[in-house]
Structures are given as structure tokens and as C-alpha cells.
């Protein structure tokens, strides 16, 4: 029997704003670096009667920027209330979470509708296995992005989150990697039967979201196939087992008994305010990719790789500017940044920003190759060393320390060539009988003997002279 299966997925994504102080008090937000329950005050641990301060300005600015970057319409000249969202959990001492009504609405990102963007406070951290709660995180500003249920496969949701995290890095001031959490909503239709929506709470990685969707797709399909019913419910993600488990039947908005927080003035955004934030907005990755192709005439694939990492893209532009913004300069920059540097980064599983390499380092290296101080092969070794030394040594220092400058002394080169010829009887024979390519292995030997410090062109010249006589 043929199967007709489709799914719809929507996400509620939470990301922390990198502010110094919390959303409604002046406690610091570096909760990961300090002893439990030290960054706390009556406001952020919800003492009755503790009066919150007006919301952190930077947090609001960042929420505006995220909403704008996601193409939202901003809520202008209207009261944006903070509401009390009531629920009972050990990480929430006041019994309610302060969460704003939308700051921006009706956006779109990668073809997925953005329902709304709003601001809220992070709760504390409850550790059920220890029975302890750490309130250091409580009150840290969070931006929540709610999408429409537009994603149709686990792969699409995964790509959406990857691109969103990349956007967070572009925007800056957000703690994307490491703090991103997503509530994942999924419903499926199987052979004409529509299941109810299931929510899986607090999935804290892209891989987790992907696994949840894969798992739920199969679980829900199996329930419907057996003639069962998909309940409207909230499930938990058991990360160690990569499965989901029923938690409770889904709350409706009524269960949270939302009321505007009487202790907090609503935010009112003006066009002026939004324009000021917009003036500081960075170029989006998509626009940068397009601009790279148009401005530098590089391949779309190369642009994609460079733009996937904001720092790498910046270095590329700075290096091109230094080398001369022409065909040669651009092609050198593509070779040594997009190909070679990227290869070393991927091999070491690190991002460019973790290497402490500076654009000047790349310019110095490329110039050394251009003026033939070092061979291309040595260039590759130096790049590996630059990454390994985390930018502490300049290419010039590494080249001289390792004694890797190109051999200028012809007698030294001739000696290496003679030795290589001596060791390559078969190849020389082949070459003499007309196989030009046989010479490559002899050149390779010379490179080995000189530890790559020979210029291949010069080597071929000397070899030919010696063999052809
Ligand atoms: Zn506090």
C-alpha cells in the first residue's frame, strides 16, 4: 500500500542576549563562570514585593535588530507589555516568567514565516538529579523567535537553525552557540488523517531538533497507522537516548493565566528608535554572498564557503584590499583563504575566530609565495603551523625558524637533482623514451630531498639539462 505522509514543523527558538546585567536588575549575567547562587538579588529570585527595574536597553535593541533581520514588521507606537506567564517549576521562584508581547511580527527567513519576536527572562537552572536549583541564570535576557509551522522535513528545520545561528553570529551580542534552545512543534498527516500538534520542549542543539523530528515523524506515523490518535501534548527530549517521552497534555494560553505585569511600564517603540538600531545593523549573510559574487567575480560556491564564517569573510575582503583588488589578488586570496586555510580549519575542527590569525598574517604569507620566497608547498606547511601556533608567530618568523626559504644556491639544487636522477633509473628511462610525465616523480624526489624548498620550475629546468645533456 502506498503511503502518503507529510509533516509540518514550527519552532520557538530562544537565544540569550549578551548583556552585562540581567533584564530587570543589575546582577551580572556570567552565570557559567561563578559559584551557584551568587549572581542573585531579590528581583531575579522573585522575592514578593521586589520591584523590577525597567528592562535592559541593550536587550531591547538586540530584539529589535533580530526582528528586523528576520524581516518583521515592528510594533510601533503601541504598548508592548511584559506579561506574567504563570507556571510552577523549581527554576521559577516567583511562579511566573516575565515575557513581552511581540516586538516584531510577520517576518520571513529562508521562506519560513516568522510569527513573532519578543523578549523574556531566562529562568534559573533546576537539576532534578541533585534536587538543587541555581538562580544565577534567572533573569538573563532572552529573545524568543516563533516561526510559523512552515518546515516540512527534519532536514529543512536543521538547515533553518544552522542559518539562524549563522545570522546570530553576524548580528553579534547574542549567545547563539551554547545557549540556543528550541521548543519543537510537529504535526503529521498520514494517509489523509491529520494528527494533533505535539510539542517537544527545550531541545538545546540543532542535532537534537533534527533527532526529535526524525523520531516523532516515525512515532506519530506508527500511532496513526495502527488507528490510534495523536494527542495534543507536550513531550520531553531524552537526549541520552535520543527519544521523546510524554510529559503532560498541552497547556493552552489559559493555563498560563497571562496578565500584564503591574510593576513594569510597557515598552513603546518609535520609528526613531528602530531607525537608530537599523543604522547599526550588519549585512545579512545572504546579501554578503550575493555581493561577493558580484563584486569579486568569484564562484557562488566559494562565496558560500567564505560567507559561512563572518570572520573568514572579513579576512578575505581585507586580504583582497591589500593584495590589490584585481583578478590576480582575488584568485590568490581565494586559493589561500577559501581553499588552503579552510582546509586546515576543517582538519583541526576549529573556526577562524579561534585561531587568532590576523589578516596581516595571511597577506604576509601570500606575498611570500607571490615573490617566491617560499614555494606553494611550503606555503601549505606554513598555514598549518600558523593555525597550530594560534597566530602567535608570523609567517616570516615560521619560515625562518624552520629554514624553509626557497633554495637560491644553484649548486645545492644541482646536487639534489643529481641524487634524484641516480635514484630514478626507471623514470629516467621512461622519460627518455618519450614519456614526459615520468619526470614528475623525479621532481617529487628533489622536493623531498630539499624539504619542499625548491622551486618546481627551476628543478624541471635543471633536470632536463642534466638528462638531455
Ligand atoms: Zn538580580
Swiss-Prot record:
Signal peptide stretch: none
Pfam families per UniProt: GatB_N (PF02934), GatB_Yqey (PF02637)
EC code(s) of this entry: 6.3.5.-
PROSITE patterns: GATB (PS01234)
ATP-binding listed as a keyword: yes
Disulfide pattern: none
Enzyme class: ligase
Keywords: ATP-binding, Ligase, Nucleotide-binding, Protein biosynthesis
Catalysis: reaction(s): L-glutamyl-tRNA(Gln) + L-glutamine + ATP + H2O = L-glutaminyl-tRNA(Gln) + L-glutamate + ADP + phosphate + H(+); L-aspartyl-tRNA(Asn) + L-glutamine + ATP + H2O = L-asparaginyl-tRNA(Asn) + L-glutamate + ADP + phosphate + 2 H(+)
UniProt xrefs under InterPro entries: Asn/Gln-tRNA_amidoTrfase_suB/E, Asn/Gln-tRNA_Trfase_suB/E_cat, Asn/Gln_amidotransferase, Asn/Gln_tRNA_amidoTrase-B-like, GatB, GatB_C_1, GatB_Yqey_C_2, Gln-tRNA_amidoTrfase_suB_CS
Annotated GO biological process: glutaminyl-tRNAGln biosynthesis via transamidation; translation
Coiled coil stretches, renumbered: none
GO molecular function: asparaginyl-tRNA synthase (glutamine-hydrolyzing) activity; ATP binding; glutaminyl-tRNA synthase (glutamine-hydrolyzing) activity
Job description of the protein: Allows the formation of correctly charged Asn-tRNA(Asn) or Gln-tRNA(Gln) through the transamidation of misacylated Asp-tRNA(Asn) or Glu-tRNA(Gln) in organisms which lack either or both of asparaginyl-tRNA or glutaminyl-tRNA synthetases. The reaction takes place in the presence of glutamine and ATP through an activated phospho-Asp-tRNA(Asn) or phospho-Glu-tRNA(Gln).
Subunit record text: Heterotrimer of A, B and C subunits.
Family: Belongs to the GatB/GatE family. GatB subfamily.
PANTHER family assigned: GLUTAMYL-TRNA GLN AMIDOTRANSFERASE SUBUNIT B MITOCHONDRIAL AND PROKARYOTIC PET112-RELATED, GLUTAMYL-TRNA(GLN) AMIDOTRANSFERASE SUBUNIT B, MITOCHONDRIAL
Name recorded for this polypeptide: Aspartyl/glutamyl-tRNA(Asn/Gln) amidotransferase subunit B
Protein's gene: gatB
Amino acid at each position: 500500500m502506498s503511503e502518503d505522509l507529510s509533516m509540518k514543523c514550527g519552532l520557538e527558538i530562544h537565544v540569550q542576549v549578551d548583556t552585562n546585567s540581567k533584564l530587570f536588575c543589575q546582577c551580572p549575567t556570567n552565570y557559567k563562570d561563578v559559584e551557584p547562587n551568587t549572581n542573585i538579588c531579590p528581583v531575579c529570585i522573585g522575592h514578593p514585593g521586589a520591584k523590577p527595574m525597567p528592562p535592559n536597553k541593550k536587550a531591547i535593541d538586540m530584539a529589535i535588530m533580530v526582528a528586523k533581520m528576520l524581516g518583521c514588521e515592528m510594533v510601533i507606537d503601541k504598548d508592548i507589555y511584559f506579561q506574567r506567564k504563570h507556571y510552577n517549576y523549581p527554576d521559577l521562584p516567583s511562579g511566573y516568567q516575565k515575557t513581552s508581547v511581540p516586538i516584531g511580527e510577520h517576518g520571513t527567513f529562508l521562506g519560513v514565516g516568522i510569527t513573532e519576536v519578543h523578549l523574556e527572562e531566562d529562568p534559573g537552572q533546576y537539576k532534578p538529579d541533585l534536587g538543587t536549583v541555581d538562580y544565577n541564570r534567572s533573569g538573563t535576557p532572552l529573545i524568543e523567535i516563533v516561526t510559523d509551522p512552515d518546515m516540512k522535513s527534519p532536514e529543512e528545520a536543521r538547515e533553518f537553525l544552522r542559518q539562524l545561528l549563522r545570522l546570530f553570529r553576524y548580528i553579534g551580542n547574542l549567545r547563539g552557540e551554547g545557549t540556543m534552545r528550541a521548543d519543537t512543534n510537529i504535526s503529521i498527516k498520514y494517509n489523509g488523517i491529520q494528527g494533533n500538534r505535539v510539542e517537544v520542549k527545550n531541545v538545546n542543539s540543532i542535532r537534537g531538533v533534527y533527532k526529535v523530528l526524525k523520531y516523532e515523524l516515525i512515532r506519530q506515523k506508527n500511532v496513526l497507522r495502527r488507528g490510534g490518535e495523536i494527542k495534543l501534548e507536550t513531550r520531553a527530549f531524552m537526549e541520552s537516548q535520543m527519544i521523546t517521552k510524554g510529559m503532560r497534555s498541552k497547556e493552552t494560553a489559559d493555563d498560563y493565566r497571562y496578565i500584564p505585569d503591574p510593576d513594569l511600564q510597557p515598552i513603546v517603540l518609535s520609528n526613531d528608535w528602530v531607525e537608530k538600531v537599523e543604522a547599526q545593523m550588519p549585512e545579512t549573510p545572504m546579501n554578503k554572498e550575493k555581493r561577493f559574487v558580484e563584486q569579486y567575480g568569484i564562484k557562488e560556491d566559494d562565496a558560500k564557503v567564505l560567507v559561512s564564517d563572518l570572520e573568514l569573510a572579513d579576512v578575505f575582503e581585507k586580504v583582497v584590499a591589500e593584495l590589490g583588488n584585481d583578478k590576480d589578488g582575488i584568485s590568490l586570496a581565494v586559493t589561500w583563504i577559501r581553499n588552503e586555510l579552510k582546509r586546515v580549519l576543517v582538519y583541526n575542527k576549529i573556526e577562524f575566530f579561534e585561531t587568532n590569525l590576523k589578516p596581516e598574517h595571511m597577506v604576509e604569507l601570500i606575498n611570500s609565495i607571490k615573490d617566491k620566497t617560499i614555494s606553494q608547498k611550503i606555503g601549505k606547511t606554513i598555514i598549518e603551523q600558523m593555525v597550530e601556533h594560534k597566530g602567535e608567530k608570523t609567517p616570516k618568523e615560521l619560515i625562518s625558524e624552520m629554514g624553509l626559504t626557497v633554495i637560491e644556491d644553484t649548486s645545492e639544487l644541482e646536487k639534489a637533482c643529481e641524487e634524484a636522477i641516480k635514484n630514478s633509473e626507471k623514470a629516467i628511462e621512461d622519460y627518455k623514451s618519450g614519456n614526459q610525465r615520468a619526470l614528475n616523480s623525479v621532481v617529487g624526489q628533489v622536493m623531498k630531498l630539499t624539504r619542499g624548498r625548491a622551486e618546481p620550475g627551476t628543478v624541471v629546468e635543471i633536470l632536463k639539462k642534466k638528462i638531455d645533456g
